[in-house]
């Protein structure tokens, strides 16, 4: 049997009162139950990345910011990523875009899964993130988890996940299965 994949679960919003903590609390038991992968939570709050101000993109030249160097080094530890994202003004939060802009090798040829949340389940943000990921040579997986509409409202009202999240188990399992498939395919191809 192949080594377990190591997946970075990125908490993508950094604002006070963020819903990301609720989404992570719901999602983490799902990924923790998997026997075919390991994971680590990467909270963007913990990396203190400055706004991107490098002379060239990381694909062309190594970054100079010590925080960005630590970020890229951390990303290199993983076989794929799942980003928990809100939708801000029909797109991803600036914190996620900035985190992508500060790295290249850490993202390259790895699968990307998403857990989106908001009024429409962050559908537009998820699609935008998938387009960004392709630019980094990533494989955005088909499966996705979207916490939207009535589910999002119920969660915001503090209702337990058992009242709003059980029907999200199937798409979450599909996304995690896709992550394992594409993560193993990428590892095999890279040798």
Give, region by region, the residue ranges found by the protein language model.
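N-terminal beta1-alpha1-beta2 submodule of the flavodoxin-like/Rossmannoid cofactor-binding fold
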Residues: 1-85, 91-98, 102, 159-181, ...
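Short, proline-centered helix/strand-breaking motifs
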Residues: 85-86, 111
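Short, glycine-/small-residue-rich phosphate/pyrophosphate-handling segment
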Residues: 108-154, 166-171
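Short, flexible coil/linker segments at domain boundaries that flank nucleotide/cofactor-interacting
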Residues: 2-3, 107-109
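Glycine-rich nucleotide phosphate-binding loop and flanking beta-alpha elements
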Residues: 89-90, 121
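Short, well-ordered alpha-helical segments in soluble proteins
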Residues: 103, 107, 133-137, 183, ...
